[in-house]
């Protein structure tokens, strides 16, 4: 009888863990789908939940930044981009978006620093980099 109870408890713990693991990715995937459908408030909620379950998920921060960009909330956009780069220093999208913010703020020293970083990170998007520096 005691063995049966122990086995039942272990089974429930394992199933609970598997369910939690699945929900981490499910929040991000569902948030991404809503983002693509331009349902930003719902997407923001799910991406924030994704971060609660997995604080080191760089893509969740990146897509939150993209939502804040759509909402014209530059402070939160920049905060989430910085978080993205802390987790994934070679994230090309985050570097480019921060460069755009730096240009808007006329913070050219930061743009130059990010440009050098971007050049090291990316070969495939160098044309984007040259375009931004010309502007």
PLM regions: where:
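Register position in tetratricopeptide repeats
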Residues: 36-37, 70-71, 104, 135
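Canonical positions in the second alpha-helix
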Residues: 50, 83-84, 117-118
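Structural marker of alpha-solenoid helical repeat scaffolds
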Residues: 53, 87, 120-124
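Residue-level recognition of tetratricopeptide repeat
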Residues: 57, 91, 125-126
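Canonical tetratricopeptide repeat
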Residues: 63, 97, 131-135
């Amino acid at each position: 009888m005691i063995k049966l109870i122990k086995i039942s408890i272990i089974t429930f713990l394992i199933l609970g863990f598997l369910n939690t693991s699945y929900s981490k990715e499910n929040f991000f995937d569902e948030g991404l789908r809503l983002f693509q459908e331009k349902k930003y408030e719902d997407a923001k909620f799910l991406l924030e939940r994704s971060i609660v379950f997995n604080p080191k998920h760089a893509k969740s921060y990146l897509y939150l930044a993209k939502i804040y960009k759509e909402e014209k909330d530059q402070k939160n956009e920049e905060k989430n981009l910085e978080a993205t780069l802390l987790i994934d220093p070679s994230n090309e999208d985050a570097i480019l978006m921060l460069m755009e913010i730096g240009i808007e703020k006329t913070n050219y020293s930061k743009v130059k620093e990010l440009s050098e970083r971007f050049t090291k990170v990316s070969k495939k998007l160098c044309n984007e980099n040259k375009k931004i520096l010309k502007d």
